[in-house]
């Protein structure tokens, strides 16, 4: 007798909660951080899955835009400058990360309109 009861089946291979949810970010680690961080006495089973999905989405969004910024600068490696350009040129990300300073990020190029040279009028026809 195997000791599993009548209709119980063998467990099989362990499957992580991240792979069950189709995520790359670690659901188990996020759950541990939620428990250890004293955010609440109890943490539901769905909360770390949802939070890991949100974090993964934000990371993918920022990396996508930073990759585009790197390609625009003819570079193959993303540096902090590319992250800065990606975040500051995106309205929603800039609002979310408005108070964040990115080390070695630099500033956005910006010239006030009044400082630009005056445009010459079109040539008058005779």
Curated annotation (Swiss-Prot):
Covalent link location (Glycyl lysine isopeptide (Lys-Gly) (interchain with G-Cter in ubiquitin)): 119
Record GO cellular component, one term: nucleus
PROSITE patterns xrefs: HISTONE_H2A
Modified residues (N-acetylserine): 2
Residue ranges, annotated region (Disordered): 1-21
Any one Pfam family match given in the protein's UniProt record, by short name: Histone_H2A_C
Gene3D superfamilies (UniProt xref): Histone, subunit A
Keywords recorded for this protein, A-Z: Acetylation, Chromosome, DNA-binding, Isopeptide bond, Methylation, Nucleosome core, Nucleus, Phosphoprotein, Ubl conjugation
Record's keyword annotation contains Protein biosynthesis: no
Record family assignment: Belongs to the histone H2A family.
Role this protein plays: Core component of nucleosome. Nucleosomes wrap and compact DNA into chromatin, limiting DNA accessibility to the cellular machineries which require DNA as a template. Histones thereby play a central role in transcription regulation, DNA repair, DNA replication and chromosomal stability. DNA accessibility is regulated via a complex set of post-translational modifications of histones, also called histone code, and nucleosome remodeling.
Protein name: Late histone H2A.3, gonadal
Organism per entry: Psammechinus miliaris (Green sea urchin)
